[in-house]
Amino acid sequence: MRVVLLASGVLCLLAGQVLSICSPVDYTLYVEKPECDFCVAINTTICMGFCYSLDPNVVGPAVKRLAVQRGCTYQAVEYRTAELPGCPPHVDPRFSYPVALHCTCRACDPARDECTHRASADGDRCSKPLLLHMHAYPGQSNHIQTL
């Protein structure tokens, strides 16, 4: 009997992982500053994927407790800094960006997460000449573990 319960528990844990496919994926940011001469493409990772959600069609206070609204968000993130080329001396050429290390499914907390994002219809575009190779400062690590 204990073996059956243990096997059932393990299967439930595995099913939860299968139903929630949320992981870091490659993403390219296009960054430019008005004062600088170039736009740069920065390769990073973001959290993306499917998280199990449940939104009942019935209205009422008791039903609200049944709703499960979770999104794919950062569990561990590291911030890196790139230096934008072609900036005049009075302009700070540094740009910091997040790199997703681990992702998780959880309810959005507006105090710590960006809960909504409206992408432009055109996608990312540069208004200046594009430089394709950007590297973070060597040896930099600003690892932040969140729970």
UniProtKB/Swiss-Prot annotation:
Annotated signal sequence range: 1-20
Role description: Indispensable for the control of thyroid structure and metabolism. May play some role in the biological processes of the immature fishes.
Positions annotated with a glycan in the UniProt record: N43
SUPFAM superfamilies for the chain: Cystine-knot cytokines (SSF57501)
Compartment(s) where it occurs, according to its Swiss-Prot or TrEMBL record: Secreted
UniProt GO BP: G protein-coupled receptor signaling pathway
Protein name: Thyrotropin subunit beta
Cysteines paired by S-S bonds: C22-C72, C36-C87, C39-C126, C47-C103, C51-C105, C108-C115
Family from the record: Belongs to the glycoprotein hormones subunit beta family.
One GO term describing the cellular component: extracellular space
Name of encoding gene: tshb
Record note on quaternary structure: Heterodimer of a common alpha chain and a unique beta chain which confers biological specificity to thyrotropin, lutropin, follitropin and gonadotropin.
Alphabetical list of PANTHER family matching this protein: GLYCOPROTEIN HORMONE BETA CHAIN, THYROTROPIN SUBUNIT BETA
Predominant localisation class: secreted
InterPro entries with a match to the protein in the record: Cystine-knot_cytokine, Glyco_hormone_CN, Gonadotropin_bsu, Gonadotropin_bsu_CS
Entry keyword annotation includes Cell membrane: no
Organism: Anguilla japonica
Molecular-function annotations in GO: hormone activity
Keywords (A to Z) from UniProt: Disulfide bond, Glycoprotein, Hormone, Secreted, Signal
